[in-house]
Amino acid sequence: MNIKLSVLDQSVGVVGRAQDQIIRQTVELAQSCESMGYHRFWVSEHHSHPGILGTAPEILMAAIAMKTTRIRIGSAGVMLPHYAALKVAEQFRVLDALAPGRIDIGLGRAPGSDRKTAQLLNPNQFASDQFPQQILELKAWLSGTPLPVGHPGHGVFAYPQSETCPQIWVLGSSDYGAQLAAHFGLPYAFAHFITDGQGVDQAMALYHNGFQSSDPLAKPKATLCVWALVAETRQEALRQFSSRARFKMDRNYGVISPLMTAQLAQASFKPEEMGALKQLEQKAIVGDAKEVGDQLRTLAERFDLDEIVVITWAHDPSVQQASYALLAEEMGLGQPAGGLKRALSSKTSEPIFSL
């Protein structure tokens, strides 16, 4: 089965590294992923979150566009209720002018923040029940289709216009997003990494069964965004996974902190936490390249996917890059000659710091 792989990077903060450096490393990672043969590179939007530093995907996408030539670049996503749909359309039309035919816009309705921060981002924010109307407007403005007579936006267009158009995706981790994507005939990305797979069967069924053909999407197009980590051995993969496990357990305690080293994370687990750690390990997609590749192929076959989006956290950027490189080789992404070797040996800044 031929599966395309894509990447979601959240610019995860890590202990001991400057936050501005983290943002620059996301751009470097996009360049590496392009050389490995990945299909898309998406970046996220979160606010007032010390563990996830990607706050302005549209700006980060522009930087990545200038440093890449082939890979598709996208937001995963733009939290649309914070913004006016027209302004978002203008931003992404500019991005499409910078990287014609390579721009994706993933849309979410979650705040990506706490309620206080969401209110400060947009004191006149749109209610979440206006999300469908915002999508309708955004579709029109991105495609250059006039809004109907009587609509407040009739006669208004988003510039610059061009022959290409950003591809809209609906993001979600519940039934709502699946049904919305199906109604509008848009591609759908299920956030498997948020739910650890819970709810995915029903969401995918709702999307496929309710899909209404649209221009330009005649049939359903869905993907899963999964958290995965690959190392030379399963033991090493689990060791590196301990950083994320510590993060998730701390979050359950109400503590949000930057990602710590695997060594510190392993030393931090208390005897009473070992059961919870074991459960996280069992749910996680971690291991050597074949183990992880087999799990991704199983998911692709189960949901009839031709593409999966992978998100990997690691304190050390070289560990993260090696994980993507090993997975690319296992899945036969067809990176240019020497691409894997370059990725594994590429120079990265020494370690220092999502959902």
Task: Name these PLM-found stretches.
Residues 2-19, 81-146, 196:
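Flexible, glycine-rich active-site loops centered on histidine and acidic residues
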Residues 5, 33, 37, 45, ...:
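Conserved, mostly hydrophobic/aromatic
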Residues 9-24, 78-86, 162-172, 280-288:
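Active-site mouth loops of central-metabolism enzymes
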Residues 61-69, 96-102, 180-183, 208, ...:
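Acidic (Asp/Glu)-rich catalytic clusters
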Residues 176-197:
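A conserved active-site cap/scaffold subdomain adjacent to cofactor or substrate pockets
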